[in-house]
């Protein structure tokens, strides 16, 4: 048993997630990155439904995975005057009718939704340089991603990759290819941390 509970809690974020009954994390790894407490894990969301079999009259549960992704939390050791959440635009936006902040960067606004409780402050936090760096990382992401920055400096990064950290998949990659992929995926996450570390 691990005496230290996980730092990362997917339900503690403003990141929009699919409807689900159960949220579970696995493969927690905690460490430091450039002096920042950091934790990564695999998050799985499942939807559980019950149905009754006509033949037997017995109730059964059906569990369906609706989301699997790689998540990282980094404590940036600084405070921010407000929170922000960035998540990808998609067809569901019209259904949710979520209010999104326009940044003035056409490419960023086409690709991402942005929410916060203070539009003026969030646009200072999300400087033009930060937006360009996020757009550059979007080009090399392993899936659709979302970012949630809390006022206390906790930075959540979630990638809907369909697999977890260090999954070997179907065994098509040799050990050298696996190491290279694992390093590339971790580097992507640390590059996103770097976007929010500087002024």
What residue spans do the PLM features occupy?
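Charged, low-complexity intrinsically disordered regions
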Residues: 1-199
């Amino acid at each position: 048993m691990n005496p230290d509970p996980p730092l990362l809690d997917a339900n503690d974020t403003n990141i929009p997630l699919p409807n689900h009954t159960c949220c579970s994390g696995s493969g927690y790894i905690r460490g430091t990155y450039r002096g920042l407490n950091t934790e990564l894990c695999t998050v799985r969301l499942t939807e559980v439904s019950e149905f009754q079999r006509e033949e037997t009259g017995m109730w059964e549960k059906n569990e369906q995975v609706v989301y699997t992704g790689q998540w990282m939390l980094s404590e940036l050791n600084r405070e921010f005057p407000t929170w922000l959440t960035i998540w990808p635009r998609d067809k569901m936006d019209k259904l949710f009718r979520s209010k999104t902040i326009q940044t003035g960067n056409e490419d960023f606004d086409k690709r991402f939704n942005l929410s916060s409780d203070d539009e003026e402050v969030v646009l200072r936090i999300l400087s033009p340089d930060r937006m360009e760096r996020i757009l550059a990382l979007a080009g090399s992401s392993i899936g659709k991603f979302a970012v949630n920055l809390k006022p206390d400096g906790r930075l959540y990064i979630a990638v809907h990759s369909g697999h977890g950290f260090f999954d070997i998949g179907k065994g098509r990659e040799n050990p050298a290819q696996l190491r290279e992929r694992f390093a590339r995926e971790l580097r992507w996450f640390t590059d996103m941390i770097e976007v929010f570390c500087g002024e």
